[in-house]
Amino acid sequence: MTLRIGVIGTGAIGRDHMRRINQTLSGAKVTAVSDVNIESVRTARADLAPEAEVVGSGEEVAASAGVDAVVVTSWGATHEQYVLAAIAAGKPVFCEKPLSTTAAGAGRIVEAETAFGRRLVQVGFMRRYDAGYRMLKAVVENEIGRPLMVHAAHRNPSVPEQYITPMAIQDTLIHEIDVLRWLLDDDYVSAQVISPRRTRHAHARVEDPQIVLLETKSGIRIDVEIFVNCRYGYDIQCQVVGEEGLASLPDPMAVVMRKDAKLQSAIMTDWKDRFIDSYDLELQDFIKAAARGTASGPTAWDGYVAAVSSDACVEAQSRPGSIVPISLPARPPLYN
């Protein structure tokens, strides 16, 4: 049986997922699309899913009899309403991050899914599907003893004028917030943000670089450098220091060239290229689970924890040097 998917939001990532579903992955096809920009949705349909129905709203996509599962790739502030609509319709839903722009909104999704009684939500934290992170997790769990510290970095070549300081947490660090929690199997208890010397390449509305300091329940200390105007490329680094050794995230495979008295290899500049395989794997995982009427991968609870942690980090940005506590309620049994 081919899973019929409705896509809500036909911007860049929505179009990417439509292409994946119809041209790269197996077991599914796009049968309905919706976007507030009618020209965007018509173009996406014509280019990528000519047999799909153009539907008037995201809620109508979720309720459609011609849709078995939903993919939400709309503007972040609308994610909550569309995920809740999918849950109300009893349909599996893949939601790009953030699950909600607020912790309260993510909490409402957790409550709705818990009341439904079965997992339906997968959140688009694709780094969990990256081969490098999976290799690193295996080493952390089996080879280097108890983790003590983590040193990480998230660097972008540049960001546009509309990228402002809180987005360094909400759009950038959010990936580290999730993947490091998964890597260490440990929740956060506090956050602190400090700002080193400011780069001259940052525009007026963004503080750059920033260093985020996190502590986990077991006492692991994490420092994450966020540098979104590093100029030289898109660079993700992660090193875990354990009692018996340390382990580092491998860099993407690249040819090493010796030429003109130089030893060099290329560094990627586009985040989509860095994690392209992960996007394919996470969506194929969703299709496989949705065909059984459920969801796998990162949960609504993971999305909620990320939102709570993100809110604490944003608060810490506004109180430089202050340590902000991170408090979570008990995890619902559905997510154990």
From Swiss-Prot:
Keyword Oxidoreductase found: yes
NAD is among the record's keywords: yes
GO MF terms held by the record: inositol 2-dehydrogenase (NAD+) activity; nucleotide binding
Signal peptide start and end residues: none
Keywords from the UniProt entry: NAD, Oxidoreductase
E.C. designation(s): 1.1.1.18
Sequence similarity: Belongs to the Gfo/Idh/MocA family.
The protein's name in its UniProt record: Inositol 2-dehydrogenase
